[in-house]
Amino acid sequence: MTTRRDFIRQATLLGAGLSMSPFFINATPGSVGANDKIRVGLIGCKGMGFSDLQAFLRNPEVECIALCDIDDEVLNSRAAETQKITGKKVKNLYKDWRKLIDNKDIDVVIVGTPDHWHCLQMVAACEAGKDVYCEKPLGNSIEECNIMVRAAEKYNRVVQVGQWQRSDPHWQDAMAFVHSGQLGKIRTVRVFSYQGWCPSIPVKPDEPVPAGIDYDMWLGPAPKRPFNRNRFHFTFRWFWDYAGGLMTDWGVHLLDYALYGMNVTAPNSIMASGGKFGYPDDACETPDLLQTIYTFDDFTVMWDHAIGIDDGAYGRNHGLGFVGENGTLVVDRSGWEVIPEKVS
């Protein structure tokens, strides 16, 4: 049986990208004493935050003792779902995330809020002595990310970002092939996300804040604006005040693997072009089409995204192509393949 100490050790390995298998899924069932429970609190219950909590709860050592959301309807429904999963009522329900951070019984905080909140909440959790699982992207700027890294180091906390593909074996296998050198010299990496499921967002008028929603808390560090449903819950990601569009939604996953595969960090130069070409008059602010070229010493990484179109490169709607002189390795969430270079 995995002990509390083992859990923290495995979490550290995952955060460092050193563990291949998600420990949530493969935990060995067994009896766990109350003092050995890892007590988790979730901030932001609507989307990926609750998916993350469900993954945590697959480990019998994890106990959810707190949920926080600014929307009463979301908070109450997630509390009921959590009770159905665990058979226990969640002890603490909050609308103010600071009260969750102040709860001394919590060991681990899951940050599942919109992107503009990640930095403040992750840093506060570290200051309070909590370990943190933070949804991607880590932050909305390089400086935010630097602050977050410094906080994790200063307070000696275990922090993992939601780059969950790092724990998926077939991605690791694909990178092992890239690193083997069998592709020959890699001249470019094509990274793409064509998301046909993303609809145009019709313009809607501002309206009064619905009952049960603490909108001022939702805005937090973002500029003060009237309530508009287009900017709230899932579709926040298409507005610059809170996020960066498809680039920071999908790009953060896929570009991570471009850097990992090529064993690099920052490029020498970046050039980008795009705009609202597919849906020029809808409510979204972020580009629905974008191409970006990152130039390194002897290769490039090319990002390409489109909203409302599914037909991307290599017959896939997302993925990476490591283009080498001997062939191209293509990988996405369904698997990977090597396409040999044709010899005339």
Each model region followed by its residue ranges:
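N-terminal glycine-/serine-/threonine-rich beta1-alpha1-beta2 phosphate-ribose binding loop
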Residues: 1-134, 143-158
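Secondary-structure transition/capping motifs at alpha-helix termini
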Residues: 88, 125, 151-157, 180-184, ...
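Structural recognition of the beta-strand scaffold that forms the well-ordered cores
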Residues: 40-43, 64-68, 110-112, 133-134, ...
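Contiguous beta-strand/loop segments that form the cofactor/metal-binding neighborhood of enzyme cores
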Residues: 173, 185, 190-192, 196-238, ...
